[in-house]
């Protein structure tokens, strides 16, 4: 099962690719301005110079391409070329229900088995206890 942001990324990256732009520039990030939108993409800015188009035109093309997608409740191109996105509540509910059906609740299995060693170091009772003794365990010195 794909994580939520990967699903959004796939849809937006496909739109960029279908319009003839670099697929990887369609990467979506969580918005640092939640008052404006939930997610944002600045791929139009990255493609503007290479394709010799204004970033706003590219952003508007991508928004038009994505307008029919039921994943988004709100899509808008804003100056200088950002694409602001809000996710449809029904899509989010469907995603959570899909997670509930999965026995691992959407958490993917580890691809590589790793061994983790946890050392619970204790104070040496033969020496006086002070802050310097705790650094050996905290930093990982032997």
Task: Tell where the protein language model's regions lie, with residue ranges.
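Residue-level signal for inorganic ion chemistry
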Residues: 38, 58, 85, 130
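Short, charge-patterned binding micro-sites
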Residues: 27-42, 78, 82-83
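Conserved alpha/beta enzyme-core scaffolds, especially Rossmann-like or related mixed alpha/beta domains
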Residues: 21-30, 76-79, 115-121
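Charged, compositionally biased N-terminal leader segments and the immediate start
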Residues: 1-28
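N-terminal catalytic cores of NTP/NDP-binding nucleotidyl/phosphoryl-transfer enzymes
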Residues: 42-45, 49-50, 94-142
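Short, small/acidic-rich helices and loops at N termini and domain boundaries
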Residues: 35, 39-57
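Carboxylate-rich, divalent-cation-coordinating active-site regions
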Residues: 63, 67-118
């Amino acid at each position: 099962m794909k994580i939520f942001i990967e699903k959004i990324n796939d849809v937006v990256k496909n739109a960029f690719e279908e319009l003839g732009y670099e697929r990887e520039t369609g990467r979506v990030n969580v918005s640092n301005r939640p008052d404006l939108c939930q997610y944002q993409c600045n791929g139009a800015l990255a493609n503007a110079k290479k394709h010799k188009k204004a970033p706003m035109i590219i952003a508007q093309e991508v928004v038009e391409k994505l307008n029919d997608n039921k994943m988004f409740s709100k899509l808008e191109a804003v100056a200088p070329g950002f694409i602001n996105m809000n996710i449809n509540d029904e899509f989010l509910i469907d995603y959570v229900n899909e997670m509930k059906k999965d026995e691992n609740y959407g958490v993917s299995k580890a691809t590589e088995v790793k061994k983790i060693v946890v050392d619970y170091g204790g104070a040496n009772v033969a020496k006086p206890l002070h802050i310097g003794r705790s650094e050996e365990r905290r930093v990982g010195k032997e």
